[in-house]
């Protein structure tokens, strides 16, 4: 929140081979940097900046392991990630592993990868081209984990499309939740307005005051409530927009139910 591009530019220049990165590189809304062993994408949005790091997963962190550590394998280093300017709103580790998903044999090692915790599971695509699993929880490193399991022949294009939609879906879900504190802050004022309205109605029915007096009090009550809601109008509008985007990304993934498993869509509802 309120992070200047200059601070982001200086931080990006600390990456390997990026010391000469020109400030003008951040004039647009999108930047992709090629790094030793991977790449980083920088995106500027209306309310947030997204950093997406692409890199191979070490061989010893795949299916068959339990709660494998991931931060220590980052090609940019955990200190660089933790020093990204601004407040962290969303932190996700998305891992794509290859396995045969024609049967459900992959489910047991995939659950083990999450340490046996309860997870949501869905098949994706009309033809069930991949499967996704997540527990929607923050791991010890402060990141939420999403596991995608896809056949070995999955193309880079399809892998990228699946990953992007999942990351956007969860990002928009968490951004939509920014409206929750505003709703909680407004709740006492709404409750007070309801009590005042109830009292006004009772006075009107009992003819305890003139119609004009009651009308003036009603107008004053309405004005106060309108001021309170106007203060949070942007946040609530943004919440509705983010929720619509989240639902759109989920629909684009065309998830399918696995017998006996809670789907991502069911959890999100």
Question: What are the residue ranges of the model-derived segments?
Answer:
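N-terminal pre-transmembrane cytosolic regions of membrane proteins
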Residues: 1-98
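Short, structured coil/loop segments at alpha-helix boundaries
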Residues: 5, 15, 19, 155-156, ...
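Alpha-helix initiation and N-capping motif
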Residues: 5-9, 159, 171, 211, ...
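Non-transmembrane, interaction-prone segments in cytosolic or luminal domains
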Residues: 12-16, 23-41, 177, 184, ...
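Short secondary-structure junctions and interdomain/linker hinges
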Residues: 19-23, 172-173, 179, 200, ...
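Short small/polar-residue motifs
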Residues: 34-39, 128-135, 239, 261
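Extended alpha-helical interaction modules
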Residues: 54-223
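Membrane-associated alpha-helical segments
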Residues: 216-269
